[in-house]
Design a protein with these regions (language model features):
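Non-catalytic accessory/interaction domains
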Residues: 1-85, 89-93, 105-107, 112
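Long, helix-rich interaction regions
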Residues: 75-85, 92-190
């Protein structure tokens, strides 16, 4: 593996440097970025850079500035890819109300799936209420399958009837059926 070191003379240290803005090179450049550089990157870089910064900011989750920035990115970034990464990083710091607002506003299925998963981890009772309310309304098979899976983790036997009604629902790759069968065996104690 070949390593190259390049040095550039500058008047002041840049917040972050983008060597390959279009991600065309078959080389990975590792940069140690400060908190301020990551916050700047998550706001201003391209989609891949913003996603990477959102992921890397999880190391600074104790900083209030990081929490504010990631919460805003998790709901308002124009790319679902970046919103999803921010949700994964900030999940432990979000309230059940934050999750509910993010779920209602979210148009793309992958971040909604992450919202269901993270909310179930950190706010199980509120997640259970939300899942029971929205499982029949969500138009994504991926999200419905995640909701069914979470019912197996945080639900109870009263959810069995609801899950059985979804078991025979058509979905690509039978993801809802597979999720329902695993959840039913969990709740029924098999």
């Amino acid at each position: 593996r070949k390593r190259s070191i390049h040095r550039f003379e500058m008047n002041k240290e840049p917040l972050f440097v983008r060597f390959d803005p279009e991600n065309d090179l078959l080389i990975e450049v590792n940069q140690k970025l400060s908190l301020n550089a990551l916050i700047n990157k998550v706001k201003r870089d391209n989609v891949i850079g913003r996603m990477e910064a959102a992921t890397e900011l999880s190391a600074y989750i104790d900083d209030p500035k990081t929490v504010r920035t990631l919460k805003r990115i998790a709901v308002h970034d124009k790319s679902w890819f970046v919103r999803n990464a921010a949700l994964k990083s900030i999940g432990s710091e979000m309230s059940s109300k934050d999750f509910l607002i993010a779920y209602i506003r979210e148009k793309h299925s992958q971040p909604r799936k992450t919202i269901i998963s993270k909310m179930s981890n950190y706010h199980a009772n509120d997640a259970l209420k939300m899942i029971r309310k929205y499982i029949d309304r969500d138009d994504s098979y991926v999200v419905q399958a995640e909701m069914i899976k979470q019912l197996g983790n945080i639900g109870d036997k009263s959810d069995i009837k609801k899950i059985k009604s979804h078991r025979d629902q058509w979905s690509p790759r039978k993801i809802i059926r597979n999720s329902a069968e695993k959840t039913l065996s969990k709740l029924q104690g098999n």
